[in-house]
A protein has these predicted regions:
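A long, amphipathic alpha-helix that forms part
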Residues: 1-19, 29-31, 35-77
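Beta-strand elements within well-structured catalytic alpha/beta cores of enzymes
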Residues: 3-6, 10, 19-28, 99-102, ...
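Short, glycine/acidic-rich hinge or "gate" loops at secondary-structure transitions
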Residues: 14-22, 139-146
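Residue-level preference for short coil/turn positions at secondary-structure junctions
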Residues: 15-17, 96, 199
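Generic beta-strand/beta-sheet core signal
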Residues: 22-25, 33, 87, 101-103, ...
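Secretory-pathway/luminal and periplasmic proteins that interact with or process carbohydrate-rich
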Residues: 28-36, 159-166
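Short, flexible, mixed-charge acidic loops at enzyme active sites
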Residues: 37, 97-99
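C-terminal cap/loop subdomain of S1 sulfatases and analogous C-terminal strand-loop tails that border
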Residues: 66-94, 107-117, 121-204
Length: 204
């Protein structure tokens, strides 16, 4: 509803055509519900699984209220992340691959079209900077700033293009690691009780 209010505001003021709107989802479906779902998500983090029969008998109506911090079971997480593998907090596609929508009628040649180039969250700021025609500031309030790692997505705005201009991208989340380069992705699941050098990698 709030997105609709924003779009209506821009339309009323004739600002729609020259406004870039970026809509990005958060992450993949979570795994904190465990194999059978939980009424209190902290039970997952504390490895204290709740009794499903007790939940159904006594606490089912708590879902959606302040008395619950519920989460769905792994089966629904897998459905939500299909066709990608695994869950939120992991570096497989099920955890980190999300939808990105960019609307800018004045600059995007074919609205509604789908792009398949790889992009990363760090590319959004670089895209905004290039679109505004400005450079990243070297300092802010007297403090030196780190260089951005993202690449602008402007090259995709003019229509479908061949290839991908982006260089390698490394990911890490809670010890799980992955690296993407030229359409290939190497990824590993890290068990916190196992040395990193013993992790098994897969190539996709």
């Amino acid at each position: 509803a709030q997105i609709g209010r924003l779009l209506a505001f821009l339309e009323e003021r004739g600002m729609t055509d020259n406004t870039m709107i970026v809509l990005l989802s958060d992450n993949g479906a979570s795994r904190e519900g465990g194999p059978q779902g939980v009424m209190d998500e902290w039970s997952f983090f504390n490895s204290e699984w709740e009794n499903v029969d007790e939940i159904v008998a006594n606490r089912l109506d708590y879902i959606g209220t302040k008395k619950a911090h519920s989460n769905y079971p792994w089966g629904w997480s897998q459905v939500g992340n299909t066709p990608s593998r695994w869950y939120k907090s992991q570096t497989y596609g099920g955890g980190i691959r999300d939808s990105l929508i960019i609307k800018w009628p004045k600059e995007i040649a074919d609205p509604g079209a789908v792009r398949t180039q790889f992009c990363h969250i760090s590319d959004i700021a670089a895209t905004v900077y290039e679109s505004l025609g400005i450079e990243q500031p070297k300092t802010l309030n007297g403090h030196e700033q780190m260089a951005m790692h993202g690449e602008s997505l402007r090259y995709t705005f003019g229509g479908p293009v061949q290839g991908n201009k982006r260089g390698p991208q490394y990911f890490e989340m809670m010890g799980h690691r992955a690296i993407w380069s030229e359409g290939y992705k190497a990824v590993t699941f890290h068990d916190q009780n196992v040395p990193y050098e013993n992790d098994t990698w897969g190539l996709y």
